[in-house]
Amino acid sequence: MAKDQVRFLKEELADTIKEFELVEKSVYDSELAHAINTGGDVYDSLLKENALQIEDLLKKLSSKYGLKSEENPRPMMPEIKKFPLQYCLENALIPIGETDKVVEFGICVPNSLNALKNLSLMIGKKTSAKFIPPFYILQSIQQKHIHTEVDVPKSDLVKDKKEII
């Protein structure tokens, strides 16, 4: 299921790129033909060939949908009992911030906005959204958990300097 969802998201991203004309039509068509021949995705081909800048995609999505974007979000797990992680991953949402009243989610496709209202009812808090690079969401879906950064102090056993013998 995760592979199908990732493929669907990449197709949706490719359609969005075409709609916003973020790459030249000839380049898009060439990468589409290549993706069809190799069984890959247009989105991946465009990234691999450096034909697409994620920053441009985020700016276009932000301006069209009136939401902010963030290029370097910090995914996190909210302090909510029985947080609906599976629902979030199924709807391409990952939590990136939390206050007492609002949980902020990162999205990469506009269809994810439809799930925010139901999610708000599930968690009992207001929700807001920001567009983030698709990499974060695709990675979370593939590995079935939210990738968070952990601030772990270094152990006393780990030495900063290499010893010369």
Predicted regions and their residues:
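N-terminal, intrinsically disordered, highly charged
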Residues: 1-165
